Amino acid sequence: MGVSKNTDKSFSRRSVLCGIALLAVGLSTERANAATTAVGATQSGNKIKLDLAKNKALAKVGGLVQIDLSDGSSLAIIRTAAGAKGISAINLSCTHQGVPVTKQGSGWMCPAHGSQFSLNGKLIKGPARSALQKYPVSVTGNSVLIG
């Protein structure tokens, strides 16, 4: 009888726990960069109505929610300042080639070619040559009308 080699490729408890920890950190970072989906937004033609009371993320400056439109594009509604004039709406398609931008730090980035935009859509770095498209916004009480 010879000595048999153990070819079992099982993982140690430590390597499993390290893997779980790395996964948790990765998921929490991704969630921190994701915009909250707007609650109760309604689209009628080219107008969108949003209830501020249902979208608590817009209560503080820097807060934002995302609205996915019927045409496949997305908008970000952003609290840029206090008061009724402190709400902005931008299209989340890069102005370079139309690729959806993603939340990156305190702004937006195009994953295709690296264009960078501020939180309110201003162009920071190309190859895009213009800011993200903005939409007119009016606020009456708790109601936001976009478009």
Predicted regions span which residues?
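Short amphipathic alpha-helical/adjacent loop interface patches that line ligand
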Residues: 20, 62, 114
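Hydrophobic membrane-targeting alpha-helices
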Residues: 28-32
